[in-house]
Amino acid sequence: MTDKELSQQAKDYFAQIRKTDRLIQRLKGTVATLRSGLTSQSYELKPDKVQSSGAKNPLESTMIKILDLERQITARIDELATMRNDTFSMIKNVPDLDQQNILIGRYIQLKNWDDIAAELSFSPKWVLKLHGKALLEFYKGNQEFFEKRLKATCEG
């Protein structure tokens, strides 16, 4: 594989963190929307009627959806924490500390390039150049992991 392809493998791995974080944010947004719907609706309390079929109580149905989404969010947060811990351990295999800082800032802390550049007192252009080198070093430092991952993808 070319250096560009190796770097892309590293980027694809890192993308999982951002995608999982976005999914968590979307699920939280859905919960917030459902909760606001609960407070904006008026529910009329009536004695229970016996029906052979029909819709459940909308309040109960919405609460069940919220609880289910909150369980999903908790599971995804646990998954994200594990991914970040694993990734942090893998980043330690990059020998250059500036490159480590860039990878941590971008992929674990999910910062933008300008913020990373300001924190490191580098120009954004230099950060991007170091980032390219860091991706390649990340792949090389974790080559066995990526080879197993590629093999599993090909077999699955």
What function would you assign to each model-found segment?
Residues E60, E79, N101, P124-W126:
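Coiled-coil-like amphipathic alpha-helices with heptad-repeat character
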Residues M83-D86, L97-Q99, L130:
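N-terminal positioning helix adjacent to the helix-turn-helix/winged-helix DNA-binding module
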Residues I91, P95-D98, W126:
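Short coil/turn residues that cap or connect secondary-structure elements
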Residues D115-A118:
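Short alpha-helical "recognition helix" segments of helix-turn-helix
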Residues S121-G141:
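DNA-recognition helix of helix-turn-helix
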